[in-house]
Amino acid sequence: MIRLRTYAGLSFMATLAVIYHAFSSRGQFYPATVYLSTSKISLVLLLNMCLVLMLSLWHLVKFVFLGSLREAEVERLNEQAWRELMEILFAITIFRQDFSSGFLPLVVTLLLIKALHWLAQKRVEYIETTPSVSKLSHFRIVSFMGFLLLVDSLFMYSSIRHLIQSRQASVSLFFSFEYMILATTTVAIFVKYVFYVTDMLMDGQWEKKPVYTFYLELIRDLLHLSMYICFFFVIFMNYGVPLHLLRELYETFRNFQIRVSDYLRYRKITSNMNDRFPDATPEELTASDATCIICREEMTNAKKLICGHLFHVHCLRSWLERQQTCPTCRALVVPPENATSAAPGQRELHQGSQQGTSSSGNQGSEISSSAGVSNNSLSRHHARLQAAASAASVYGKSMVYPSANTVAWSSGVPGTEQVSTEPDQTLPQHNLPVENSHAYANMSETKLEEMRKSLETHLEILRNRLHFLETRKPESAGEPENKGKSVADAAE
C-alpha cells in the first residue's frame, strides 16, 4: 500500500507537470488538449495516471466491502493475476486489429473486476467455514456481490449493444463473453451463500443443502462449458484459434465431466442405501463408539458400511455427495466392479477354506498315509540293502574263498562261464552303515543306486561261489548253505 501511495504521488506530480507545460506553451485550451493527445510522452503519462486512478478505486472498493485481506486471499489473488494476465495478452494478439489507446483501459478494468470476483469467492468460502460471523460481515459480502453483479451487467450490456450496433465481430465480443462468465459466477456465489444462510438459520439441520449445492455447481459448469464452446467457435470462425481459451475450455470440460461422474456414482449409491448399507444393531452400537465422526453427535440409529464403521443416514448421504470413501478408514464405500465380481469367488474361497479346515484332518491323514507308503517303500529298500550287506559281511567272514586256479566251472553245464584264472578275485570293500538305518536316509538317490548295483554284484559273486561250494563239498557246507540261501532270498 505504501508503494502504491508513492507511485500514485509521483504519477500525479508528473501529470500536473505535463498539463502545466501544455497550457503554458500553447496558451489556449484547444491547442493544449491537441498537444496532450498527440504527444507520446504526454499520452503515456496520462494513461499512467488513469491506471493509478483505477488502482486507487479498486483498493477503495476492496476496503469498503472486504476490509483487510487475509493471507489466503492474497495468495489466491497473486496466483490468479499472473495467469489471467497471460491469457489477456494472448487475447490481445487475437484482437490486434482493434488495438487502440481505449482498448488498454478496458483490459485493465476487466482484470481488476476479475480480481474482485476472486476475492468475493474466497471470502464466501471463509464465511462458510467460520463458526461465528458478525452481521456486518454478512451485510458487506451481500452488498459486495450485488455491486459486482451490477458492474457485470452494465459492462455486458454495453458490449452487447456495441455488437448489435456494429453488426460485426470485434473486441466487444471478447468483453461481452467475459462479463457474461463473471455474471453467472457471481449469481452462483450468491445462491451458494443463500444456501449457507438457510442452513445456518436451521441450526445446520438442512439435509438438502449439499444436494442443492451439488446441483448448483453442476448447472454452473454446464452453462460455462456451453458459453466457452460457443465463444470458441465464434472466435475461430472470425479470427482463428483462440489460444487464450484452450486452458479455460479444458478445465471447464474436465470439471463438468468429474461432476457428472460424481453425480452418477452418487445416485447409484444413494438409490438403494437401505439395501446396500444395513442398519446397525444395538449390540454394534454398544460395542463401538456411538458417536458419528461426521457430525460428532451420538447415534441411536445408524448405517453400517462394508468396512464396519457406523454413521448417521443423513451424514452419510451428505458425505457421499463429496466423495465415496469411508470418513474413518478411507476405504471405498462401494468397491469397484472388478472387485465386486471377484468377491463371490473370494467368498467361495473363504468358505472353501472354512470347509477345508474341517476336512484338513482327513486330508492330512491321507497325505500322511501316502507319505507313510513312500516311507515304507524306502524302508523296505533300505532293509534289502541292509540284508544284502549283512549277507556280504557274513559270507566274507565265514567263507574261505578258494584260489582262482581251483575255481573252474564245468564246461558241460549250460549257461555257465569260465571263471578267470587270474589271481584271487576279491570283493570290493565298502563302508556300509549296517546298524544305522538313518544314514541311508541322508544319502542321495544316485549314491543309493550305486550302492545297490555294487551289492547286486556282490550277491552274484556270492551265489556263484555258493553254487561252487555246493557242488564240491555238499556234506561239510550244508548248514552255511541254508543260512546263505535264506539271507540271499531275504535280500531279494
From Swiss-Prot:
The protein's matches in InterPro entries, at most eight in alphabetical order, are given as: HRD1_E3_ubiq-ligases, Znf_RING, Znf_RING/FYVE/PHD
Q: What class of enzyme is it?
A: transferase
Query: Which residues lie toward the Lumenal compartment?
Result: 25-40, 120-135, 192-221
Query: Could you give a single Gene Ontology term from the biological process aspect?
Result: protein ubiquitination
Q: Which spans does this entry mark as compositional bias, Low complexity?
A: 351-378
Q: Please give the residue ranges for the topological domain Cytoplasmic.
A: 1-3, 62-98, 157-170, 243-492
Source organism superkingdom: Eukaryota
Q: What SMART domains does the record tag this protein with?
A: RING (SM00184)
What is the protein's membrane topology class? Multi-pass membrane protein
Which reaction does this chain catalyze?
S-ubiquitinyl-[E2 ubiquitin-conjugating enzyme]-L-cysteine + [acceptor protein]-L-lysine = [E2 ubiquitin-conjugating enzyme]-L-cysteine + N(6)-ubiquitinyl-[acceptor protein]-L-lysine
Zinc finger RING-type: from-to: 292-330
Segments passing through the bilayer: 4-24, 41-61, 99-119, 136-156, 171-191, 222-242
The biological pathway it contributes to is:
Protein modification; protein ubiquitination
| Disordered as annotated region, ranges | 339-379, 470-492
Functional description taken from the UniProt entry = Probable component of the HRD1 ubiquitin ligase complex that mediates the rapid degradation of misfolded endoplasmic reticulum (ER) proteins, a process called ER-associated degradation (ERAD). Targets the misfolded LRR receptor kinase BRI1. Functions redundantly with HRD3B.
Q: What protein family is recorded?
A: Belongs to the HRD1 family.
Please state what the protein is called. Answer: ERAD-associated E3 ubiquitin-protein ligase HRD1A
Q: Look up and give the organism this protein is from.
A: Arabidopsis thaliana (Mouse-ear cress)
Q: What gene is this protein translated from?
A: HRD1A
